[in-house]
Amino acid sequence: MSPHDDAINGTGDMTDRRPLLAAQEGIWTGQQLDPDSPAYNTAEYVHIDGPVDSAVFDTALHHVVAETKALNVAFVVDEQGQPWETDAPAGDWHLHTADLTAEPDPHAAALAWMDRDMARPVDLARRPVFGHALLRIAPEQYLWYHRVHHIALDGFGLSLVARRVAEVYTALTVGEPVADSGFGTLASVRDEERVYRESARFAKDRDYWADRFADRPPVATPAGRTALPARTFHRRVVDLGAVQTETLRAVARDLEVTWSEVLLAVTAARLHHATGASEIVLSLPVMGRLGSVSLRVPCMVRNILPLRVTVTASDSLRELAARISRELRSGLPHQRYRYEQLRRDLRLVGGQRRLSGPGVNIMPFEYDLRFAGHPSTVHNVSAGPVDDLSVNVYDRAEGAGLRIAVDANPDLYDEADVTALQEGLLSLLGQAVAAPDRALGELRTREAVPVLDGGPLPGPVRPVLGLIADHAAQRGGSVAVEHDGRSITYAQLFGSARDLARRLAARQVGRGDVVAVAVPRGIDAITAILGVLLSGAAYCPLDPTAPRARKAELLDDARPALVLTASAHAADFGDRAVVRLDQPEPESQEAARPTAPAPTAPAPEDLAYVIHTSGSTGRPKGVEIGHRALAHFVAGATHRYGLHHGDRVVQFAALHFDTSVEEVFLTLCAGATLVVRTDDMTDSVPGFLDACARLRISFLDLPTAYWHELAYAISTGAAALPAEVRTVVIGGEAALPERVDRWRKAVGTSVRLLNTYGPTEATVVATVADLHDPSLAPGDVPIGLPLPGTRAAVVDGELHLLGDNLAVGYRGDRPPDAARFAPLDAVHEAPRAYRTGDLVRIGDDGQLRYLGRSDTEFKISGHRVHPAEVESALLAHPGVRDAAVVGQLLHDGTRRLVAHVVPDGPAPAVALIRDHLRAALPAAMVPSAVEFLDRLPRTSAGKIDRNALAAMAPDVHVPDPDAQVPDPGAETAAHDSTLERTIAAVWQQVLAVAAVSARDDVFDLGAQSLQVIQVANRLSVELRRDVKVAWLFQHPTPAELARFLKQQEQQAHAQVQPRPAGPGLPPTLLADAVLDPDIRPGGGHPRAAGTPDRVLLTGATGFVGVHLLAELLTSTDAEVVCTVRAPSPAAAAARIHQTLEIHQIHLSDVARKRITAVPADLARPRLGLDEALFAELTRTCGAIVHNGATVSIMREYATLRAANTESTRDLLRMAAVRSTPLHFVSTLSVAPPIGLAPEVPEAFLPPHTGLRYGYQQSKWAAERLLEQAAERGLPVTVHRLGRIVGPHATGYVNERDFLWSVLRAGVPAGIVPDLFEEETWTPVDHIAQALVHLSLGQRPPTATVFNHATTPVRLSDVYDWLEEYGYPLRRMPLAQWRAELRGSSGAFGAVATTLAFFDSWDADTDEATGPELRLGRVRADNVVTGLHGSGITCPSVDRDLVFRYLDHCVTTGTLPAPAGKQGHPAMPAK
């Protein structure tokens, strides 16, 4: 029979069934992770030195198999998914035989046959689970191969069977009767296990391990990462000779330990050397049979003992072996407690969670087998699956020595790694045994440190400014930079930069200085950085849209001579010296220019730029890059990338990312054209690529996170790569192998895909890999080889970078960080190196592969994030006592941050924590998940146990992006819900949360800008249509986005072009505006007239609401129950008191005691109150003031209906029980504009086409509900407010007000729009006083509408007062204002929000004039009548009051101080 025949198989019948042994359950679970994997096959072959009678051997085998119960079973699953063991007699299986003596290498042919048989998966539901072969390799040399699934036998069980086969074969051969096997029964093992689990010993063992691993120590492995067991493994076998083995045994006796404990000590020391970990946790397989009936039963009972030991470099072999011996003596008595159960106990199941690391399997079995007198040797083929590394040690018989086989998971290590690990282990073993009292750290294996060299630079290195100057002189007419329809030639660019350099020199800026550059993306930004460099100074880029606190922190670190920025952002920099690029210099500075010294060209040792990264100390750190490093990088990267002057390169990154250095300087130094992307280019991936095609882009330099989405879209056919693109460069974080494979299949090798790696400290990029290389295997994503002029050394697995591209160091005094720059003694001449903290390995092809980090640093969307910096921001929150942040790698390869917070009292709302962090940190550093704990876990040394926190992070299942989803295009009645599910599934995947419901606002779940881009891209692919990023911002719930997309689809089918002049009302709006028939005055006792003792107030933490609260407490004696969005009453109260302080409202302690804070949520049924509390408030509150609402000028009705309309319905239901008066705060914007109605009555309004945006619509619907309630006899009032401005007393300004948003956007740029002629402005303190008097002063009639309208304020007067205050303004039509504002400052922050509001009206209005915001005459007769005789009068809004508002804005930084003064004289002293 040929050795290439199929592997042995068969079938069998099932009879009864039995539960699996605990050890078998672990094997079963592991097999289900990959049912077709052969990893759980275990096998040996016995080399028999002598003739073998194959027929007798076959008889002996059948005899032993028949008497071995574990080999006559199958494994089945019941309807509940529970596995069972059933009887399945082996039956007619056969011994495979083959004569291989004719093969060129019979022994090799036999091993090859075994490899093929081992690669066949076993069907556990069929019999048999084993196989045997007898292979003849010489006339009297045979190999008996026996393979069995690990669920049936462990290694010791396999040895029992082998010994029994030798015994039976010998008896049959010599003609003696076959003795009884002496095997025990499986039933006895099962009974023993049951008794153990019910015993006190089980509990004692459990307690021992739970205590030993309570802190869940980190698991250190040379790979630095995890992977599932592969279907194969790398193996390297070395025999330790008899003399070496005897020396080992002798030293062990001298040390009073066993030889296996010496091997364990050396292995632990070797892992300590490779990982630097202070604790090593080994996986030690144990028989678990001593003193057990299983000692004579072939079965699977093997367990894993996690051996935890501290290792230091100063340990000697004597000390470490003794420590391990003590640990073993402590743990072995508890070895029966199952390893799998301990992992469950410690919540270390799934994901990256591990209990122990590399395995050391010591097999001292007596294996002296003789077959009819002929000797044999046993060779292990496979000991089972390999998670990471396994060191298998076989004690061979008759003094033959030890065999050491190192097995490794090929998904984590290559063959070179295995060789290095084994040789290092044996080298350390030899030295340690020779000097057992010498520190093991001194015996560190002196393996040659591998150094990769990028080779020489292609020619002399020239300064970047010199290269750009040459292009300006020689190719001055060529386009250097394009942006949004504008372009500038090299001559113009260099001339503008030179003018700026002279301007800076006039301010005494030059060599040795740093200039901060906070300029939005565009031509001005490129001019700014070149101008700074030409002045001799270094530039420090800042994100102009970053929170002010963040910018202040970076400026404190950078210590710039001045700040270059646009007028729109100048106010953010306080009293620092500022140069406004969009404004001419003051005359004094202009006059100084001719006498100023000429700019001095920088020297190679001067700084070129300072760029900030996240810092391990909790503060960002500025990395200083010199001109020499920048020039070397440009020379090496330009050569490696093949960039030339004919290329057109997208400038994608913001300046404060160091990728911008690569984009800008490589392009300009090559004489190519830099095309600066616009904001709308990234609305969708297809849109981005279409724009690239229109712009004739040939070279794309993209963040890896964005490229992931681009690769996905291209691979699915949702987008196409422009034909002009010839090179794509990616970098910033590890590329996902799945995305790389998609790209290769879709794009092939026609376009170069370069994967770059490099920390900021090595000037952007240090290594590059060609991912389009067809020789790369699927899933292989190297980071490549060093750039020319750069070298890379790998020391104990950590990457060190060498060369002239290294940073000067860090800004300021940073000893811990500066230690990363140091001479590398392991390399010849000890050159200066940067220790990256990145773990890598060198593949067989000589290229680097990234493995992970050696510290806690994490990459999120290209941002380097040190947890300490996020933790520092968290601890600044008043409601946080302690905090720790960990990075979580999800199943699909994406990453997120998880914050673990110990609250200081009641837990603050997660949304408030996120708001706090957004004010201090970049968006990518705001954690996606926040978990509250009573305390943080800590190690025995008192440090935060980050491994325990990582294990506690929510184990989120992320759906497969390729998984089948319901067809969103199917025409069914459930179309909308199907589409909702599709949208929710994509959000769930990207946000990495357990679930996203149709009504979840994804921004409340932590969505960030890059994730919105990802979702827009994946929905475009899934729905086979373009989904724009802006739509996701406008429709933040799956339900609303589904409705919006459906409406668009219907309009497209109906070919509605153009859209009607006035948008129709949302289809749900009119239905929502119908009051439930059961809401009507009930039979309860009606309220008594007069001021109530208890008032329910919603919205007390808002601008109007906090003043209403103050007025209720001042003018009445009532208790005020305030509903507040908060997790607890204490947190709700804290929010109220904080709001009072912010608005400078001072109340007596007596008044404050009348505030009752109730946690609630207007967007939930019954306001989020439980039935009991809702009923109590219904019974006890004598009036309801419904002021709370979600106010947004951008959001659609569907996202506001719950909080604004449905909450009103719930409060009407409360009011109806006892006819409790309900006073509703509405808005004059519900009224039709002047074009539809010349007058606004004090009456309820019918629907009209002026209800254009969600907030209007939600308030109108609520009024309709109140109108119907009034018709049924319920006492209600409606208070419509116009523009509510700050209190007359303090001049406080509500920055969220729409008009103030317009002023914040336009005043710094010196431009304001013509919006309307006039509108009502009412101070908030007057509104509060009037509303409380009108609502509670007397029992109202069944329905009264109050239009709170005062004397109108003319917008032209407001603009005049602004100019009088000191702001030079140009007034212009809205369309012009929008265009100039977008061009002068970019669409960022408040500017972006304001512009987005007007953008949302474009389809429905005349863009030349904008939306119609004017109202007709506002009737306020009811207000006048109601306030008559009360003494309440509204103060006028005049120049003095507006000046007080402006004083407040300047003081708080809402607006910049006018040029030449620090504010109006009326500004209060500080």
Swiss-Prot record:
Q: What is its EC number?
A: 2.3.1.-, 6.2.1.-
State the Pfam families in the record.
Answer: AMP-binding, AMP-binding_C, Condensation, NAD_binding_4, PP-binding
Question: What is its biological role?
Answer: Nonribosomal peptide synthetase (NRPS) involved in the biosynthesis of a unique class of isonitrile lipopeptides (INLPs). Catalyzes the final step in the pathway, i.e. the condensation of a (3R)-3-isocyanyl-fatty acyl-[ACP] to both amino groups of a lysine, producing isonitrile lipopeptides. Can use (3R)-3-isocyanylbutanoyl-[ACP] as substrate, leading to (2S)-2,6-bis[(3R)-3-isocyanobutanamido]hexan-1-ol.
Which CDD domains does this one have?
A_NRPS, SDR_e1
Question: Disulfide pairs?
Answer: none
**PTM annotation (O-(pantetheine 4'-phosphoryl)serine): residues:** 1009
GO MF, any single term: ATP binding
Keywords, ordered alphabetically: ATP-binding, Ligase, Nucleotide-binding, Phosphopantetheine, Phosphoprotein, Transferase
Q: Where is this region: Disordered?
A: 584-603, 1049-1070
Name the needed cofactors. Answer: pantetheine 4'-phosphate
Source organism = Streptomyces coeruleorubidus
Q: Say if the entry is tagged with keyword Heme.
A: no
Q: Note the NCBIfam families from the entry.
A: AA-adenyl-dom, Thioester-redct
Q: What is this protein called?
A: Isonitrile lipopeptide synthase
Reaction catalysed by this enzyme: 2 a (3R)-3-isocyanyl-fatty acyl-[ACP] + L-lysine + ATP + 2 NADPH = an isonitrile lipopeptide + 2 holo-[ACP] + AMP + diphosphate + 2 NADP(+); 2 (3R)-3-isocyanylbutanoyl-[ACP] + L-lysine + ATP + 2 NADPH = (2S)-2,6-bis[(3R)-3-isocyanobutanamido]hexan-1-ol + 2 holo-[ACP] + AMP + diphosphate + 2 NADP(+)
Listed InterPro entries: AA_adenyl_dom, ACP-like_sf, AMP-bd_C, AMP-bd_C_sf, AMP-binding_CS, AMP-dep_synth/lig_dom, ANL_N_sf, CAT-like_dom_sf
Per UniProt, the ranges with Low complexity bias are: 1049-1059
In its UniProt record, which GO terms are filed under biological process?
antibiotic biosynthetic process; lipid biosynthetic process; secondary metabolite biosynthetic process
What does the entry note on its domains?
Contains 4 domains: a C (condensation) domain, an A (adenylation) domain, a T (thiolation) domain, and an R (reduction) domain. The T domain acts as a lyine-specific peptidyl-carrier protein, and carries a lyine residue that is transferred to it by the A domain. The C domain catalyzes the condensation of two isonitrile-containing moieties to both amino groups of the lysine bound to the T domain, a rare activity in nonribosomal peptide biosynthesis. Finally, the R domain catalyzes a four-electron thioester reduction, releasing the product from the NRPS and forming a terminal alcohol product.
The gene designation is scoA
